[in-house]
């Protein structure tokens, strides 16, 4: 196995073996930890800080629950009343928290590569990228890969279709990287041309501007919301809804046992119809549940740095 990176900043730093072992460990935490309400002591005595400069429900709360289930102390500073609001630089804040004994820095920021810049400032400790701009969101990709494998265990036979605002989606970037690493042979990106990336960088990735053809023979369908905060409001929401909203009629074009995913937050009746979001093919809430277990596995691995302890 290749050496584990010091920080979790992007998906390309993880090998297939890293990802498989993380999924295995997360499934353990799901069955032996969460379902039994167990608390572990792996992170006992360690301090985790959630530094979220953008809104979050699922990611921030699941990291907090994950850290507490591993025995850590968790800080959730109100950044609006922190010293940053008085003019202190972000990096001085980081060094201050490090001096207080914080070991894990869970960082979400609107600017690309801010977590990487923070990692360069640390003498010790670990930075986990919880989403930076439209760049990367590695823990969400790991959750999505875990969820896919629970239903579709053979990576080399999968067709995964990702629908929506892919150009501005850090979730899509990380998921594509992860799917390529796992050897998925067919990855389809679907949306209006203005919301698709200019380049895809891998032969397994194809672009579509019509929904129904992209769904043929799909095993996994991932819907994404419009990232309105990351671009101007030039997207015609009604036109997007009419062409790219996943409805029961359109879902019929996919395989009968296809699963439907969404990383959240869901904008119902825009990218996905409620009848699809709530039907038996939807695994959206399973993704949320898996989120705590996978983030437990991530925190444990980046502390112990060795799968032999698993």
From Swiss-Prot:
Which chemical reaction does it catalyze?
A: carbamoyl phosphate + L-aspartate = N-carbamoyl-L-aspartate + phosphate + H(+)
**For L-aspartate, which residues are the binding ones?**
86, 170, 225
One matching Pfam family is: OTCace_N
| Protein keywords | Pyrimidine biosynthesis, Transferase
What molecular functions are annotated in GO for this chain? amino acid binding; aspartate carbamoyltransferase activity
Name any GO cellular component annotation.
cytosol
The pathway noted for it is: Pyrimidine metabolism; UMP biosynthesis via de novo pathway; (S)-dihydroorotate from bicarbonate: step 2/3
The keyword Transferase is annotated on this UniProt entry: yes
What is its biological role? Catalyzes the condensation of carbamoyl phosphate and aspartate to form carbamoyl aspartate and inorganic phosphate, the committed step in the de novo pyrimidine nucleotide biosynthesis pathway.
Q: Which HAMAP family match?
A: Asp_carb_tr
- Quaternary structure note: Heterododecamer (2C3:3R2) of six catalytic PyrB chains organized as two trimers (C3), and six regulatory PyrI chains organized as three dimers (R2).
- Family membership: Belongs to the aspartate/ornithine carbamoyltransferase superfamily. ATCase family.
What name appears for this protein in its UniProt entry?
Aspartate carbamoyltransferase catalytic subunit
Organism equals: Coxiella burnetii (strain CbuK_Q154)
Recorded name of the encoding gene = pyrB
